[in-house]
């Protein structure tokens, strides 16, 4: 529960505010920045939750603004932080950019949104699709249509009633991003899998969906066995449509989905991951005038799978020139802005090996410079459809609509791709 919401600039000046409960003086916001600076100086780090004289200051920082909630109650700080994050997402959906200028340019719209997303200090709806049915923006003005959508007052705020499709379909994508750092000898230094289940729902009415995965915890709790592998997910996060109480009780993922595309859940796995594509790179310096690279790339995933649009980014000396390349597959480009050569392989089948040889001139490089250059790792980018590193599987996706009683077709796809860090040290 929040008593008031403020949007401040970096100097702590109020851009816009909304008092919901009138139980605290609005002037206390002036203490926010001094209090924040004092805590950072004492503790050596910042914290998103501050308390002073019985008032809680809960905030997030985005670009050049602070979104601040003040509360006199003993509120759930995490709940308020999630609300502020979702409020920021709503503003971004409306303005494209959340910054001081966009807030000032859309004062009327911001006030309308603040009135709808919170009522008497209690969060209401932060689903942009629902808000856009009620509040629309044209040339920085707001048009309000009555009556409000039923979803605004429903328990199911993320979905409107009366949705109809001629063809009822659900597309489910399991997307896994692999972060990996490996040493030159093949030892995996660090690895993790970040996964998400993304749905595109084109379903009429108010459908009930149940999703079954090869969840290890589920089968152990039920004392059942399953043919094939099971997976143990960590840090699982769900969209608000998922019935958490039921999941905690019997691990069933049941929900009434929003219309269109959304991320149903995300998860992490920290198990040791074998490099999906292994790269060995050897370089030889010839009399300080040129450098030669011998590169081998091997796909270490299942033979029936194919990696698409593989990029192998190999560092080279910054002032290397006159590149010449030979490769058994794909093509190589010199990227001087990255001080690297980029080996592009359109299709890389599992179990295959490809080779590349490169030769470049060294007009001014010194031996010690080359030693420093070797410390830069090889980076990889790729996407492998119909494959998951973790082995996660969708066992079933059941769709029921008790009133309309239609048959819907679910489509399931899998893809594994590189994460933000996929590198092999040389």
From Swiss-Prot:
Record-given protein name: AP-1 complex subunit mu-1
Source organism of the structure: Schizosaccharomyces pombe (strain 972 / ATCC 24843) (Fission yeast)
Main location (coarse class): membrane
Gene: apm1
Subunit structure: Adaptor protein complex 1 (AP-1) is a heterotetramer composed of two large adaptins (gamma-type subunit apl4 and beta-type subunit apl2), a medium adaptin (mu-type subunit apm1) and a small adaptin (sigma-type subunit aps1). AP-1 interacts with clathrin. Interacts with sad1.
Superkingdom of the organism of origin: Eukaryota
Recorded GO CC terms: AP-1 adaptor complex; cell division site; cell tip; clathrin-coated pit; clathrin-coated vesicle; cytosol; endosome; Golgi apparatus
Matches recorded under InterPro entries: Adaptor_comp_med_subunit, AP2_Mu_C_sf, AP_mu_sigma_su, Clathrin_mu, Clathrin_mu_CS, Longin-like_dom_sf, MHD
Disulfide cysteine pairs (residue numbers): none
Keywords: Coated pit, Cytoplasmic vesicle, Membrane, Protein transport, Transport
Domain MHD stretches: 167-425
GO-annotated molecular function: clathrin adaptor activity
């Amino acid at each position: 529960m929040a008593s008031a919401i403020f949007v401040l600039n970096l100097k702590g000046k109020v851009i816009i505010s909304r008092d919901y409960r009138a139980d605290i003086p609005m002037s206390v916001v002036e203490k926010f920045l001094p209090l924040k600076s004092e805590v950072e100086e004492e503790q050596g780090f910042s914290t998103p939750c501050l308390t002073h004289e019985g008032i809680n200051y809960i905030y997030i920082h985005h670009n050049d603004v602070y979104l601040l909630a003040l509360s006199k109650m003993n509120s759930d700080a995490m709940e308020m932080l999630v609300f502020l994050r979702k409020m920021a997402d709503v503003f971004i959906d409306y303005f494209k950019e959340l910054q001081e200028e966009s807030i000032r340019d859309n004062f009327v719209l911001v006030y309308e949104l603040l009135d709808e997303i919170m009522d008497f200090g209690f969060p209401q709806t932060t689903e942009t699709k629902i808000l856009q049915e009620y509040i629309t923006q044209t040339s920085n003005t707001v048009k309000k249509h009555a009556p409000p959508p039923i979803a605004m007052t429903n328990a199911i705020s993320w979905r409107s009633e009366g949705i109809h499709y001629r063809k009822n379909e659900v597309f489910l994508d399991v997307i896994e991003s692999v972060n990996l750092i490996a040493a030159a000898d093949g030892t995996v230094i660090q690895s993790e899998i970040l996964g998400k289940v993304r749905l595109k729902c084109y379903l009429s009415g108010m459908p009930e969906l149940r999703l079954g995965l090869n969840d290890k915890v589920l089968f152990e709790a039920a004392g059942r066995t399953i043919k094939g592998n099971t997976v143990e997910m960590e840090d699982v996060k769900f969209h608000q449509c998922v019935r958490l109480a039921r999941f905690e009780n019997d691990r069933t993922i049941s929900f009434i989905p929003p219309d269109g595309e959304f991320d149903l859940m995300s998860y992490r796995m920290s198990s040791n991951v074998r490099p999906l594509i292994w790269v060995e790179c050897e370089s030889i310096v010839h009399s300080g005038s040129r450098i030669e690279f011998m590169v081998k790339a091997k796909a270490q995933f299942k033979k029936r799978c194919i990696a698409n649009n593989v990029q192998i980014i190999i560092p080279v000396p910054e002032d290397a020139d006159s590149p010449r390349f030979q490769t058994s597959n794909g093509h190589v480009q010199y990227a001087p802005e990255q001080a690297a050569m980029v080996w592009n392989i359109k299709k890389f089948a599992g179990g295959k090996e490809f080779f590349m040889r490169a030769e470049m001139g060294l007009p001014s490089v010194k031996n010690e410079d080359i030693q420093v250059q070797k410390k830069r790792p090889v980076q990889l980018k790729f996407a492998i459809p119909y494959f998951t590193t973790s082995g996660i599987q969708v066992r079933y996706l059941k769709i029921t609509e008790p009133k309309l009683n239609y048959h819907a077709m679910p489509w399931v796809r899998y893809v594994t791709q590189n994460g933000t860090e996929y590198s092999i040290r040389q």
